[in-house]
């Protein structure tokens, strides 16, 4: 009889604790809408590999010297040559684009709905206004073919479109090797439309000899909400980079001797590039109902490019 009572006593505290109410606080997170999948969808409901990065509050806390600052800690994405402003940033997604000698190949780049990738598959980001980047969507895997042939991945970049931000903003970023980025953003808001003006002046002498660059970027974006179902966006971007020097590669013994020196051929041939880039485009968005919409865009680009290579033809 004593043993039976002892067993009941041991079980009794278990029933007491099992009736304690759960004290874990529950937090409801806002839905994340993905726009790079052609149809706006909830991130939890799409069977795709998508990464979304929002920089609305964070863009003022990075150097903004390269687009690689906006793609850190993204699975399957690798960047290199972020400090070589002559050969520009190289990006690969799951191996696509890794064999590119310079620039970006095999990956579709879209800025505010307008393709930044040329018909031959080459992409450049030297005209991207980094101070206006508000969000980045990265689509990996074979579903990137929704955006065209040979798309090993898609990077959709959205710039500032919210006129509720500060109507005038000045910012200055300074770093080592005489790096400076002076930016001014002006937002003019009307009843149903707004105009965003952004100017970025960037300079740097570079870590190595013959690796400095100079760039001026002007970006205008006009947004007009015609009614509840129609919206028109007009934008123009102009970039003037009179020089971006290329220091070239070094051998191991040259690195051990002086890692900041430039390759001799690059100095002898004065290797650099010069770019003037103009892009303008108009997009129209028509929303028929909650389940269907129509997007159309027209754009024009002109790129004046000059470069000097470290060898004879």
Enumerate the language-model features and the residues they cover.
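N-terminal periplasmic "start-of-domain" segments of outer-membrane beta-barrel proteins
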Residues: 31-61, 88-92, 107
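Extracytoplasmic beta-strand/coil segments of soluble accessory domains associated
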Residues: 68-114, 283
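Outer-membrane beta-barrel translocator domains and adjoining extracellular loop/strand segments
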Residues: 183, 208-214, 245-252, 297, ...
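Short acidic/polar hinge/loop motifs at secondary-structure boundaries
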Residues: 79, 106-107, 114-140
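Transmembrane beta-strand segments of Gram-negative outer membrane beta-barrel proteins
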Residues: 31, 134-135, 153-154, 159-174, ...
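Extracytoplasmic loops and strand-loop junctions of Gram-negative outer membrane beta-barrel proteins
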Residues: 119, 138-139, 166-169, 201-206, ...
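N-terminal periplasmic accessory domains that precede
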Residues: 67-70, 90-94, 107-111, 124-126, ...
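Transmembrane beta-barrel wall of Gram-negative outer-membrane proteins
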Residues: 174-203, 208-246, 271-289
